[in-house]
Amino acid sequence: MKNFSKRMTTLLSKVEERSYSPIEAIKLVKENANAKFDETIEAHIRLGIDPKYTDQQLRTTVALPSGTGQKIRIAVVTRGEKVNEATKAGADLAGEEDLVDSINKGEMNFDLLISTPDMMPKVAKLGRVLGPRGLMPNPKAGTVTTDLEGAIKEFKAGKLEFRADKAGIVHVRFGKASFSEEALLENLKTLQTTIEKNKPSGAKGKFWRSFFITSTMGPSVEVDINELQDLQKEK
């Protein structure tokens, strides 16, 4: 049996073992996010997929309407004039083979890596260090592109890349405790719609298994997925 702190025990006592409507769940998570910093709000969604099969893998991006409230560091591997273009567009790091060499040595002071197509043969060799961290650029995720300015601005504004892990669970941050309930709800609705639109072709049986949201230091609250889907139909 887990030993919880007095604070967590108090917070857990406020959460019933049932699913809540989306807005109820958001209100409860915000109420429980009472740490001395602006806690991140996250979604943890179990899907009815087995990612060991290629037709049951999920990897995509979502542009959250209210952003994430989190600053991310972006690195760009490119060459020539595009290095300056990336820097001017807001990249925190930009370089050619020198940046590839730094990454290969384990120097990864960034949250997202973007590459132009011509540099992917070199970046692909970094699979050993990038793969386990989920940082390998991918065309489907918009991180392999010639439009560096557009990609950098989108990701800085709150566009997120996410994937289902080996257990078929998606982990996505979708805001901060300081966000309004309405902003968090819009982000959550957008996330659910994005996953639905990118449902793997090989998914069988019940697709939505469980849907929980939580704050950095708070307990998880289950969201009623049927009610969340109904909100989309009301649009």
UniProtKB/Swiss-Prot annotation:
One of its GO terms (biological process) is regulation of translation. CDD domains: Ribosomal_L1. GO terms for cellular component: large ribosomal subunit. GO terms for molecular function: rRNA binding; structural constituent of ribosome; tRNA binding. Keywords: Repressor, Ribonucleoprotein, Ribosomal protein, RNA-binding, rRNA-binding, Translation regulation, tRNA-binding. InterPro entries: Ribosom_uL1_bac-type (IPR005878), Ribosomal_uL1 (IPR002143), Ribosomal_uL1-like (IPR023674), Ribosomal_uL1/biogenesis (IPR028364), Ribosomal_uL1_3-a/b-sand (IPR016095), Ribosomal_uL1_CS (IPR023673). Pfam families: Ribosomal_L1 (PF00687). The keyword Transcription does not apply. Part of the 50S ribosomal subunit. Binds directly to 23S rRNA. The L1 stalk is quite mobile in the ribosome, and is involved in E site tRNA release. Protein L1 is also a translational repressor protein, it controls the translation of the L11 operon by binding to its mRNA. Belongs to the universal ribosomal protein uL1 family. HAMAP family: Ribosomal_uL1_B. This is Large ribosomal subunit protein uL1.
